[in-house]
């Protein structure tokens, strides 16, 4: 849903390659990446969450909390920022590239976000589509290089 939302609103002539549900082994761990967008700015790695309730967390924290039943039930879960950071580390390790990687966390609108971050956007789908569309980063790849990186990432996929 998140990627369809973004891709559907993009200009078709821009260089953009999309991979969803990438499973690979980085040599140590099995890794699942929800979505990757490769464009001329680099590699955008998106972790999606579909949680209800109120989500509390800070960028620096390892555990976040999900408040359910009007605060009567609190569930801890691993920070999606830390999780996505691990995905990016594994991708860089396998690809051996200096291309910039960007991290994004996207929650569906089932819940409310009470999250504080500075470097990693934690947003709903519409805000994410605006964030990535308006991303201020230098182009580091041409179309052919972006396509080559796309195929290199696809080659990591477990059969």
Label every model-predicted segment.
Residues 1-31, 37-43, 49-57, 63-159:
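Surface-exposed interaction regions that form or flank ligand-binding interfaces
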């Amino acid at each position: 849903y998140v990627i369809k939302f973004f891709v559907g609103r993009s200009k078709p002539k821009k260089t953009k390659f999309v991979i969803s549900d990438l499973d690979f082994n980085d040599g140590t761990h099995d890794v699942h990446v929800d979505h990757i967008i490769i464009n001329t700015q680099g590699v955008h790695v998106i972790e999606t969450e579909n949680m209800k309730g109120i989500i509390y967390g800070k960028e620096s924290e390892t555990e976040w909390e999900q408040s359910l039943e009007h605060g009567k039930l609190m569930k801890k879960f691993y920070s999606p920022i830390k999780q996505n950071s691990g995905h990016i580390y594994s991708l860089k390790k396998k690809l051996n590239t200096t291309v910039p990687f960007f991290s994004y966390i996207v929650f569906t609108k089932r819940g409310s976000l009470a999250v504080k971050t500075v470097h990693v956007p934690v947003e709903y789908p519409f805000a994410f589509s605006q964030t990535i569309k308006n991303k201020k980063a230098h182009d580091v790849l041409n179309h052919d290089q972006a396509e080559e990186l796309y195929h290199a990432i696809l080659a990591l996929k477990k059969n």
